[in-house]
Amino acid sequence: MSKDVRQLLDKTYGGNPLSREEAKCLFASLVRGELDEVTIAALLMALKVRGETIDEISGAADAMREAANSFPRPALDGGILDIVGTGGDGFNTINISTTATFVAAAAGANVAKHGNRSVSSKSGSSDLLGQFGIELTMAPQTAANCLEALGICFLFAPHYHGGVKHAVPVRQKLATRTLFNVLGPLINPSHPDFMLLGVYSETLVRPIAEVLCALGVKRAMVVHGEGLDEVALHGTTQVCELRNGELVDYSLSPKDFGLEPVQVTELEGGSPEDNALITAAILKGEGKAAHRDAVALNAGCALYVAGLADTPQAGFKLAIDTLASGKAYEKLIGLAAMSQQDKA
């Protein structure tokens, strides 16, 4: 451990905020494996107890983005979109954001979905996609080929962020939320231009939008929907929208989209096998209305953020029409087939 890193740790332990560059230095040391487990635990808890600042979150994200395995981002008209949540909201819902990515892609967006295994549900994005035969550890060039040909790819977080492994045992033993809970959505190796990002707490909505602005994201909606890290079908969603470098706070309700609220229990998921059946039904234009509407709400807001709809409501209508066409399911089948090309 260098003298500079030791001084930064002491500064953190003293309750003093770090600059963005200082936070980057500390977390670069972490992902290089230079900090032992006790030090990592002390760092994460010192930040948690005081409360992480915008600069600290941004600096940690800078370090992890810089250390990531590179993704050969293709030159695409219209930019790249990600639909992602922090997880950790405590609800075991169906895979709303993951399912919404296929709808957005079928409606014309280029979606690079960055995900991992489950945090709060029984089935995270990679758990679900594996059920459809999608090769999670596809080579970066294969993922880029999928994005260019199909308008969608999946980037499995551990495949790109090997340095995070140094914090895994500590996070498991601490068994409490830390900075790493919000870092995942911020370190997509495709560096998306547009994001619909759900957070597990309303208090994170504006701060994370400020971080996205600092990281250079062009347009985004950061959302929290009455307990869920999604746009809510069961109640009011708090939104902070990033547009042209400015942040605007507002709320959305199901009635804004011509929908009646449902009970959150109607969105409960199950095992990866159960959720795969639900996702397939939704993408084929079948299944429960509540499932369809929850996915279309999130896909619609993402299409709005990506500039493919003038309003969230117009995005919702486009998503509903896309689901009815069955084209979203075709995207899923296409990704499953193309992701396997490394094995051919």
Curated annotation (Swiss-Prot):
Annotated positions binding anthranilate 2: 171
Cofactor(s) listed in the protein's UniProt record: Mg(2+)
Binding site for Mg(2+) 2: 229-230
SUPFAM superfamilies noted in UniProt: Nucleoside phosphorylase/phosphoribosyltransferase catalytic domain, Nucleoside phosphorylase/phosphoribosyltransferase N-terminal domain
KW Transcription (keyword) present: no
Residues annotated to bind 5-phospho-alpha-D-ribose 1-diphosphate: 85, 88-89, 93, 95-98, 113-121, 125
GO cellular component terms listed in the entry, alphabetical order: cytosol
Disulfide topology: none
Cofactor notes: Binds 2 magnesium ions per monomer.
Function statement: Catalyzes the transfer of the phosphoribosyl group of 5-phosphorylribose-1-pyrophosphate (PRPP) to anthranilate to yield N-(5'-phosphoribosyl)-anthranilate (PRA).
Protein name: Anthranilate phosphoribosyltransferase
Organism: Shewanella amazonensis (strain ATCC BAA-1098 / SB2B)
Name of the gene: trpD
